[in-house]
């Protein structure tokens, strides 16, 4: 550097002396660091030194202790010999401490406290909060699936009861005798609500071309007109009171 214009003429000599002294101290410090780095890569580490090289990895209080007072050290370094030798020969960096070593010692806290301490950052808190929302939604889905399953079970039970009721109605009608054979045939054709397919209705309604209502085209010759048949269970000829009486009778027989 050119120090010709550095300061005025009165203090120039003092400044030059100061700069030279600082430069000389800096060069000596660099030379000392080079020698120390070179000697740390040799197998004779620590023979010509008053302090051990391993103490650079220890706490500051142990670092100041001389070689002769090594017995005063409380605990030995947790690093094994192989890792310590690698650190001496290759100047490798120390591995990061385990997560539980941050803050207070792990022996004074439970695992739950350490987990809470790990998740104290805002990012991790948001992450775990979203995970809690996902878990709640999964529980709600399972709850809804349970409700659907229960409703399906109820529907299955009702279906089985309706099937039993229909079979009981058919059996009770068949026990009335041969005089109600036509009504028995009619009742077997009824399953559920009346539809066009069930009763074989014609396009013109109950009467078509001035002919009375018949069951279907294939039964015209076998069956007579409905108004000529004597039946006690024709739905279109029975009153609401008779239908309710039959239903009450069927339920009383089931119970």
UniProtKB/Swiss-Prot annotation:
Post-translational modification Phosphothreonine, affected residues: 18, 240
Protein's cellular compartments: Nucleus; Cytoplasm, Cytoskeleton, Microtubule organizing center, Spindle pole body
GO CC, alphabetical: central plaque of spindle pole body; cytoplasm; nucleus
Bias (Basic and acidic residues) ranges: 69-91, 211-231
Modifications made to the protein after synthesis: MPS1-mediated phosphorylation at Thr-240 is required for spindle pole body duplication.
Residues with the Phosphoserine modification: 65
Protein known as: Spindle pole component 29
Upper classification of the organism: Eukaryota, Fungi, Dikarya, Ascomycota, Saccharomycotina
């Amino acid at each position: 550097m050119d120090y010709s214009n550095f300061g005025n003429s009165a203090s120039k000599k003092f400044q030059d002396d100061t700069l030279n002294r600082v430069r000389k101290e800096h060069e000596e410090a660099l030379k000392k660091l080079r020698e120390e780095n070179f000697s740390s890569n040799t197998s004779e580490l620590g023979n010509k030194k008053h302090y051990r090289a391993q103490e650079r990895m220890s706490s500051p209080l142990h670092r100041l202790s001389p070689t002769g007072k090594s017995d005063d050290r409380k605990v030995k370094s947790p690093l094994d010999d192989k890792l310590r030798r690698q650190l001496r020969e290759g100047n490798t960096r120390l591995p990061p401490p385990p997560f539980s070593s941050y803050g207070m010692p792990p022996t004074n806290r439970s695992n739950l406290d350490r987990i809470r301490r790990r998740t104290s950052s805002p990012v991790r808190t948001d992450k775990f909060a979203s995970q809690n929302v996902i878990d709640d939604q999964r529980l709600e889905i399972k709850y809804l699936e349970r409700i659907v399953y229960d409703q399906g079970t109820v529907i299955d039970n009702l279906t089985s009861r309706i099937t039993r009721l229909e079979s009981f109605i058919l059996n009770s009608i068949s026990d009335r005798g041969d005089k109600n054979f036509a009504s028995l045939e009619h009742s077997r054709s009824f399953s559920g609500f009346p539809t066009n397919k069930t009763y074989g209705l014609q396009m013109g309604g109950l009467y078509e071309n001035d002919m009375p209502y018949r069951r279907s085209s294939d039964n015209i010759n076998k069956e007579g007109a409905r108004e000529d048949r004597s039946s006690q269970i024709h739905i279109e000829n029975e009153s609401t009171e008779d239908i309710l009486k039959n239903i009450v009778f069927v339920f009383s027989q089931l119970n």
